[in-house]
């Protein structure tokens, strides 16, 4: 029913565009995404399908900087994936508990430092994990590499002015469970705020951005 409703809504937007010439296709795209977010909002204040502009791992330099199989990165990730949240939460929420522990450790200890003037420097995780400092690029690369080194699926989202990590936390059927896990493990940080997910092919991805205090 939701698909049928969205289909007619899209047809309606195209009809609107033919009547109002100033409405661009990009505007329709944005309206469509906004409609999806509104249509899938639920009482848990979850904003589902957060549209992302940019590409995933298309920058070769980002690929080269990733080190998910490096022994030091693996040791770092294992240690800090168990630093927070008792085993009872692992039994309750599963492997996402480890991902959230990593997020919390890196987020709490990271200090923002700009790149050298006129240069976009990508720090490898083996460097970043010692410094615990750098810009959003370095943070995203360390976060993604750490998640991947403990068996998680992560991707780096590249936009013109920002870079951040998204982590796969299940499928769309797990939406309520993951939302509950985030609110349980980050109660003070979330408070009454929304949790933002991104759906891709039925899979559920959550933002592990430096600018957010919780996933």
Model-derived features with residue positions:
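Active-site-adjacent structural elements in enzyme catalytic domains
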Residues: 85-109, 132, 138-141, 145, ...
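Hydrophobic/aromatic-rich core segments of domains that either
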Residues: 138-215
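Hydrophobic membrane-insertion alpha-helices, especially the h-region
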Residues: 2-17
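Pro/Ser/Thr/Gly-rich intrinsically disordered low-complexity regions
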Residues: 22-29, 51-54, 67-69
């Amino acid at each position: 029913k939701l698909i049928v409703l969205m289909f007619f809504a899209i047809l309606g937007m195209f009809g609107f565009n033919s009547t109002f010439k100033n409405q661009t296709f990009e505007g329709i795209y944005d309206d469509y995404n906004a409609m999806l977010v509104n249509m899938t909002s639920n009482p848990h204040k979850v904003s589902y399908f957060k549209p992302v502009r940019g590409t995933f791992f298309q920058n070769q330099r980002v690929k080269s900087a990733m080190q998910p199989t490096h022994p030091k990165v693996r040791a770092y990730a294992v240690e800090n994936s168990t630093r927070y949240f008792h085993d009872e939460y692992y039994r309750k929420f599963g492997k996402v508990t480890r991902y959230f522990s990593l997020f919390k450790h890196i987020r709490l200890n990271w200090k923002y430092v700009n790149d050298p003037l006129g240069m976009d420097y990508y720090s490898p995780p083996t460097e970043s994990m010692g410094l615990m400092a750098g810009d959003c690029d370095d943070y995203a690369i360390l976060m993604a590499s750490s998640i991947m080194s403990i068996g998680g699926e992560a991707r780096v989202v590249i936009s013109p002015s920002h870079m951040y990590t998204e982590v796969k936390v299940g499928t769309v059927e797990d939406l309520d469970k993951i939302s509950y896990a985030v609110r349980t493990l980050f109660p003070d940080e979330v408070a009454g705020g929304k949790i933002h997910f991104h759906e891709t092919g039925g899979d559920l991805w959550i933002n592990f951005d430096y600018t957010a205090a919780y996933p």
